[in-house]
Regions:
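Catalytic machinery of carbohydrate-active enzymes
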Residues: 1-148
């Protein structure tokens, strides 16, 4: 288990599928209950924004939109300037892993099995999860920081 500061700035990255973002909402409340003084930011793509924007446990929602090179540079620059303490990549794709890395957060959590796992400094092994439902993977990631 990784110890994080009580007032940590936490970023959850979940891009792509709306259905996967729905699964991901199940981790917001346990995170806030475990770290009530933490700031929780969720990063999603535009189609999923409305699913999470009014969630009571989220302090901020960032919306990634593919656009011009300049707009992407501005977006990544914003991620770096935010100075997150903990970033959890719940996406499983290259873009989420790169975003996680570019935050320069001291704690970057992601999937151990991914070829891009070198971008994380805390990795979660999923081979022992039974059954392997999407929510099991999400929960395993937040357990890494002590969420029960």
């Amino acid at each position: 288990m990784i110890k994080i500061p009580p007032k940590a700035k936490i970023l959850l990255i979940k891009l792509r599928s709306i259905g996967d973002v729905v699964y991901n909402t199940a981790v917001y409340t346990p995170l806030k209950e475990s770290f009530p003084n933490a700031s929780l930011t969720v990063l999603v793509e535009r189609p999923s924004y409305d699913l999470v924007c009014d969630h009571p446990d989220i302090d901020e929602v960032l919306c990634f939109e593919k656009g011009s090179l300049w707009s992407q540079i501005q977006f990544y620059s914003r991620l770096i300037r935010a100075k997150y303490d903990v970033v959890i990549d719940m996406h499983e794709g290259t873009r989420g892993a790169v975003m996680c890395f570019l935050t320069l957060a001291p704690i970057r959590i992601g999937h151990k099995f991914a070829k891009r796992s070198f971008l994380y400094n805390a990795k979660v092994e999923f081979s022992d999860l039974e059954p392997k439902f999407p929510i099991d993977y999400q929960v395993a990631l937040i357990k890494k920081i002590g969420v029960k």
